[in-house]
């Protein structure tokens, strides 16, 4: 599997967990094992989160700045 290129400002798809379906997430910061940002869809839309980087299924769009 190829490594995903996750950068601040990109939108990623977070894998579903527990009773939460997969959802889009706007990335603020990228760390070694987790990212920070805001859920864009799903029951946590508008909420801040810190999902583990292993939950990222794909990068949906690149950096939204500029």
Predicted features along the sequence, with ranges:
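Short beta-strand-centered aromatic/proline hotspots
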Residues: 21-30
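Compositionally biased, low-complexity intrinsically disordered regions
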Residues: 1, 7, 51-54
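Short coil-to-beta transition motif at edge beta-strands of beta-rich domains
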Residues: 3-17
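Intrinsically disordered, low-complexity boundary segments flanking structured domains
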Residues: 1, 14, 40-43
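Intrinsically disordered, low-complexity, charged/polar segments
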Residues: 39-66
